[in-house]
Amino acid sequence: MTAEAEFIVDDDRRGVLKALASGAVLAATSDVWRAARAADDDSLAVEALRGGLSLITGAGGNVVLLATPEGAVQVDSGSSARSNDLAKLVAERLGSSPARTLFNTHWHLDHTGGNEAAAPSGTPIVAHENTRLWMSTKFYVEWEDRYYRPRPKAAWPNKTFFSSDPQPLSIDVGKARVEYGHLPEAHTDGDIYVRFPEQNVIVAGGTVTAGRYPVLDYITGGWIGGLADATKKLIALCDAETLVVPDVGRVQKRADLEAQRDMLETVRQRIEAIALQGRGVQDMIAEGITKEFDARYAGDSKLFISNAYEGLWWSRLRGIVA
């Protein structure tokens, strides 16, 4: 990937950049991204989950903390805007607890923006290798119309794993076991879940959303089929009592994941059917391919459709759709 890489394709073939140029889709990205990060404007709040687990909201993305006498685990570090407040809150809750391990569920700044504050020198930062790669390079995200610069090296994950590694992987913190694994090409190409088996809690990062359409970051490897597969994988790890922590917002249950899976599979089928007729995103939007889901999933369905098509084209339809 070059430093100034731009992911531009023929708009006559796909009809996507015409929509972007008109501003209809690109203007919506800021609204959806603001909604996804709306928690930055909230006060930090702590909700007890189970067995020493706490959910911290208002820091950007959801943050989960496990505190034990032997050590601590933190999943995600929120946004940079709230990093100092979050670090202070975590320190207050941990007290004199030994050094902790930090997990990053993916690279997005509302989940990794506080890494430097959350992870003093020497703290293990666990993530998929693709997350480290995105955090250490410069790249352009077309749907945001934004360049991302490399993060400071202190923020990079320093304990990464690959898709080929045996999974799930695990660490032990005192008597508590923490399991984690890769969710390939879903929200991004570096998504992971973090599972606390004893508490029956899964932290799903950006692969699960609460009451809004998922963000399909196709520039960094996400696509709708991969997200559907990731959702199925998470469902297989759940029972009726499992708590699933989404990227932002309220805790989800297995039934919520099943609804997300059904929505993703239905929308994918409709996108493929229209694309294989040689038609594009504007036709998909005009036909209202998400209309029965709009009441459940807030946000701009136009952006969701556009990003779903982009990711599907790059992952599966390129070379098939002329």
Predicted regions and their residues:
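Active-site metal-binding motif and surrounding structural segment of the metallo-beta-lactamase
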Residues: P69-G71, A81-V126
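Conserved beta-strand hairpin/beta-sheet module of binuclear metal-dependent hydrolase folds
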Residues: A45-E92, S97, I192-F196, N200-G206
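C-terminal regulatory/interaction regions
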Residues: V281-A322
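Metallo-beta-lactamase
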Residues: A48, G71-A72, S77-A81, R132-T266, ...
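N-terminal secretory signal peptides
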Residues: M1-D12
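N-terminal export leaders
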Residues: D12-A27
